[in-house]
């Protein structure tokens, strides 16, 4: 058996017969020795040297038998035989990964003509994608010209300058002439100087009275001009060395090359939520845009937008599909179409995931549904993320205060910052809105040394907005993951950048990436508390407050809140009383803690038995005066979250009407306490007096505070917080001396003067509507306040604005005849005084002004919840 296997193996290895001589190695040696004769110089060469000789051999100049039409190297001849090149154009918008560069059978990569390539407009990341377009039929001359372009750029052309025929010379001359006539559409590079020249030409075109360009186009270009032409603090500009080359060419193309319709559509898409939009609906929504289909084609060709060929996922299509399209698609796949939109989306999504192909995947089913949805939707477009990011950078540099992501936290209803900014600029241009900021503003935000710093700040803002959005939607795990990303950004930040950010003034640090990332870490502790992971929350809070030295100089306004939350977690949730007492003693040494948080920490310390016996309270305030009144209440829930509804009698109609608890109290004091005027202002009347007396100090625009005005749209200087007093100390003190010594009539005249000059202006301090009778109403209020009390209150605002800008009592009441004034904090059922309110009530009481807490109880016998 073994012998048979061995014979079988030998049979397989053994050759079938004798080797043919032509296939033998001897035949190869003989072929090499014979060589080959050159047909041009008739010289014999070995096969090894024949090919290289043919690349250099020329016909003699006096040869009468041969006329050379054109000469090519071997590689050039291969390109000739390959046919016309594949031209990369603008008709396709798919990514390189989906249309890879093709190769010939010779494995030579096709080289596209430079003049036929329109490069992608990259985003801030600088990533450029090429897109492939099917080539059209070319005649012989075009083929020859295309190949000549390739030859001219090849190494062989440079190293071996062959004699050209007249045909080739003429072709090169035509190519040079065409190059001298630059096609602006194919312009691939630009400078900031060229962008400014293009802006000047645009301004000349739209300056005529017959021009009707939309305001948002003119304002967008105005923003661009101001950003790239305004001098920074250090004397430099946002010039060519700051921007990427792709950024500058995008600016140039937007201003110079795009048509009016394309500009309008692009800006409209930019200021809207970045998503897919149906072209038909865009036509209906923006009828003022001329030839919107041509605009779409132009923008797609210029790589500013994507068409629906870039819509790759089912979720993208489902998100923009209306009920009609969804029903038609569900009917096509034999699903139940008698549902609402959300149910139809879920049904299609579930169907796509449940139907497996023969290979076990669901991709083919999803693609079929996606294809059907695209057919139903028709043409769709989406502005490219790179363009959106770049223009957000422009708007951020122009007005960092308005585009600050902290505004989303303070006002969650703020959904479209950039659209609001454009409309606000229109209002300023029309004169319907006035701000105290200089217009035009001579200074621009200068916190970003390079493009990467600006990009990091943009990332941090987007990250914070995403965290807040996920938290509001209840997606706490996703929000926590984003907060962890923020912490990693801080850890990976270079030491040079950290030192630079720390060298900035406090009001400038707010517009840097490390400040926003630090605030995102604060969101993480809030998320963990909502998830009842108190131990992890404490670890994050300790890192923010104690451990991580790199972030101690940021989010100073929030440090007191973080201390209070950490102590609450240790005391109430984790029951670690000793650790809480230890942390309290560390917290009291933190100079950045505001007075209101300090009082909260003090209250907790007084309740802890573990605190040392010699503990000294840092703040000593008395208890405010209390008053209790009753009012009629209807306990009824109408779906708005309120249960207790206060009712009062309207004397004009003799009907019972619903009102707020503050209105109940205000009426009580006007009818029963001897006051003739009262407003529910929460301190705005006092802030108005502060703004009137110190207007030229707070809103000064001289060189010493010039860096606090970064845009024409600011309603206050950017340092109306920590450094307000320190930067203007001398001027504040001079004004306080004047208030102490000036005659009553002179001060009243000053109030009237400032009121007449500025009452149409919108600024952070003055609430003109609180005095409906104008300046005289304000003067009558001033006459009721004792001068020493007024100076004490205004000094507290000036010296510690960050600590005292809020917390004022709800009601301010006065009587010009009796010269009496009072402040009242109103508390309904179940309400408690905050530490800010306790502090202000104590300040008013100490200054001699009547300050009370008024509790409103139910008229009926039922206790209110």
From Swiss-Prot:
Zn(2+) binds at residues 38, 41, 53, 57. One of its GO terms (molecular function) is phosphodiesterase I activity. Its EC number is 3.1.4.1. It catalyses: Hydrolytically removes 5'-nucleotides successively from the 3'-hydroxy termini of 3'-hydroxy-terminated oligonucleotides. Its cofactor is Mn(2+); Mg(2+). GO terms for cellular component: nucleus. Transmembrane segments: none annotated. Mn(2+) 1 binds at residues 810, 825-826. Gene3D superfamilies: 3.40.1350.10. Disulfide bonds: none annotated. A zinc finger (UBZ4-type) spans 35-62. InterPro entries: Fan1-like (IPR033315), FAN1-like_euk (IPR049132), FAN1-like_TPR (IPR049126), FAN1-like_WH (IPR049125), Rad18_UBZ4 (IPR006642), tRNA_endonuc-like_dom_sf (IPR011856), VRR_NUC (IPR014883). It comes from the Eukaryota. Residues 90-140, 162-187 are annotated as: Disordered. Keywords: DNA damage, DNA repair, Hydrolase, Magnesium, Manganese, Metal-binding, Nuclease, Nucleus, Zinc, Zinc-finger. Pfam families: FAN1_HTH, FAN1_TPR, VRR_NUC. Binds 2 magnesium or manganese ions per subunit. Disruption phenotype: No visible phenotype in normal conditions. Strong increase of embryonic lethality following cisplatin, nitrogen mustard or mitomycin-C (MMC) treatment. GO terms for biological process: DNA repair; interstrand cross-link repair. Residues 744-857 form the VRR-NUC domain. Residues 93-112, 174-187 have a biased composition (Basic and acidic residues). Mn(2+) 2 binds at residues 682, 810. It is found in: Nucleus. Nuclease required for the repair of DNA interstrand cross-links (ICL). Acts as a 5'-3' exonuclease that anchors at a cut end of DNA and cleaves DNA successively at every third nucleotide, allowing to excise an ICL from one strand through flanking incisions. Belongs to the FAN1 family. This is Fanconi-associated nuclease 1 homolog. It comes from Caenorhabditis elegans.
């Amino acid at each position: 058996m073994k012998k048979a296997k061995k014979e079988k193996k030998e049979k397989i290895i053994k050759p079938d017969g004798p080797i043919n001589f032509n296939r033998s190695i001897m035949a190869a040696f003989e072929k090499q020795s014979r060589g080959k004769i050159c047909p041009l110089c008739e010289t014999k060469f070995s096969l090894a040297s024949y090919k290289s000789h043919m690349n250099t051999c020329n016909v003699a100049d006096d040869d009468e038998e041969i006329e050379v039409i054109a000469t090519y190297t071997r590689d050039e001849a291969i390109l000739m035989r390959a046919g016309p090149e594949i031209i990369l154009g603008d008709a396709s918008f798919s990514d390189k990964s989906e249309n890879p560069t093709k190769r010939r059978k010779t494995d030579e990569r096709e080289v596209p003509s430079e003049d036929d390539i329109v490069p992608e407009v990259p985003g801030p990341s600088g990533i450029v994608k090429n897109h492939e377009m099917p080539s059209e039929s070319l005649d012989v001359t075009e083929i020859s010209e295309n190949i000549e372009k390739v030859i001219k750029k090849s190494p062989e052309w440079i190293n071996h300058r062959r004699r050209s025929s007249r045909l080739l010379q003429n072709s090169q001359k035509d190519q040079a002439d065409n190059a001298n006539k630059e096609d602006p559409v194919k312009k691939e590079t630009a400078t900031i100087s060229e962008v400014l020249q293009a802006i000047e030409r645009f301004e000349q075109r739209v300056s005529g009275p017959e021009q009707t360009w939309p305001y948002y186009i003119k304002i967008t270009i105005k923003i661009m001009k101001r950003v790239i032409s305004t001098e920074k603090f250090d004397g430099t500009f946002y010039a060519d060395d700051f921007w990427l080359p792709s950024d500058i060419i995008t600016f140039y193309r937007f201003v110079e090359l795009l048509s009016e319709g394309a500009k309008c559509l692009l800006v409209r898409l930019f200021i809207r939520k970045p998503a897919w939009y149906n072209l038909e609906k865009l036509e209906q929504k923006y009828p003022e845009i001329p030839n919107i289909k041509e605009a779409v084609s132009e923008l797609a060709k210029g790589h500013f937008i994507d068409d629906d060929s870039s819509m790759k996922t089912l979720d993208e299509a489902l998100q923009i599909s209306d009920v009609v399209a969804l029903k038609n698609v569900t009917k096509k796949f034999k699903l139940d179409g008698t549902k609402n939109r959300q149910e139809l989306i879920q049904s299609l999504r579930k169907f796509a995931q449940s139907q497996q192909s023969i290979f076990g995947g669901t991709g083919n089913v999803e693609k079929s549904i996606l294809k059907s949805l695209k057919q139903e939707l028709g043409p769709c477009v989406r502005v490219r993320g790179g363009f959106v990011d770049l223009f957000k950078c422009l708007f951020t540099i122009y007005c960092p205060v308005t585009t600050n992501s902290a505004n989303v936290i303070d006002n969650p209803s703020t959904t479209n910052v950039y659209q609001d900014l454009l409309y606000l600029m229109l209002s300023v241009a029309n004169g319907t809105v006035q701000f105290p900021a200089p217009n035009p503003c001579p200074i621009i935000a200068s916190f970003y040394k390079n493009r990467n710093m600006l990009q990091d700040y943009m990332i941090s803002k987007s990250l914070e907005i995403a965290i807040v959005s996920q938290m509001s939607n209840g997606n706490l795990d996703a929000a926590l993951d984003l907060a962890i990303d923020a912490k990693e950004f801080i850890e990976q930040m270079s030491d040079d950048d950290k030192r630079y950010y720390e060298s900035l003034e406090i009001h400038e640090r707010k517009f840097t990436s490390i400040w926003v990332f630090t605030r995102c870490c604060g969101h993480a502790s809030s998320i963990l508390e909502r998830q009842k992971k108190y131990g992890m929350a404490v670890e994050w809070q300790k890192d923010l407050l104690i451990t991580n030295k790199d972030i101690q100089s940021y989010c100073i306004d929030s440090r007191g809140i973080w201390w209070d939350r950490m102590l609450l977690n240790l005391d109430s949730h984790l029951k670690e009383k000793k650790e809480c007492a230890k942390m309290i003693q560390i917290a009291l040494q933190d100079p950045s803690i505001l007075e209101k948080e300090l009082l909260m920490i003090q209250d907790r310390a007084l309740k802890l038995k573990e605190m040392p016996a010699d503990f000294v309270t840092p703040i000593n305030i008395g208890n405010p005066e209390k008053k209790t009144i009753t009012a009629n209440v209807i306990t009824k829930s109408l779906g708005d979250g309120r249960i207790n509804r206060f009712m009062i009698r309207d004397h004009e109609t003799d009907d019972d009407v619903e009102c707020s608890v503050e209105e109940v109290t205000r009426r009580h004091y006007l009818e029963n306490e001897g006051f003739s005027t009262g407003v529910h202002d929460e301190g705005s009347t006092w802030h108005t007096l502060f703004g009137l007396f110190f207007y030229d100090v707070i809103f000064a625009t001289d060189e010493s505070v010039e860096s606090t005005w970064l845009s024409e749209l600011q309603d206050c200087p950017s340092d109306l917080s920590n450094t307000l007093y320190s930067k203007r100390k001398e001027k504040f003190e001079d004004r306080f001396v004047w208030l102490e010594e000036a005659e009553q009539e002179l001060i009243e005249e000053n109030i009237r003067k400032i009121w007449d000059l500025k009452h149409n202006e919108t600024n952070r301090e003055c609430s003109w509507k609180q005095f409906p009778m104008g300046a005289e109403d304000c003067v009558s209020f001033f006459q009721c306040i004792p001068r020493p009390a007024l100076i004490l209150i205004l000094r507290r605002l000036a010296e510690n604005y960050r600590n005292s800008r809020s917390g004022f009592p709800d009601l301010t009441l006065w009587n010009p005849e009796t010269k009496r004034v009072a402040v009242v904090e109103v508390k309904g059922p179940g309400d408690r005084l905050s530490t800010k309110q306790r502090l202000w009530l104590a300040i008013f009481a100490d200054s001699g002004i009547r300050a009370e807490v008024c509790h409103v109880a139910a008229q009926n016998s039922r206790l209110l919840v």
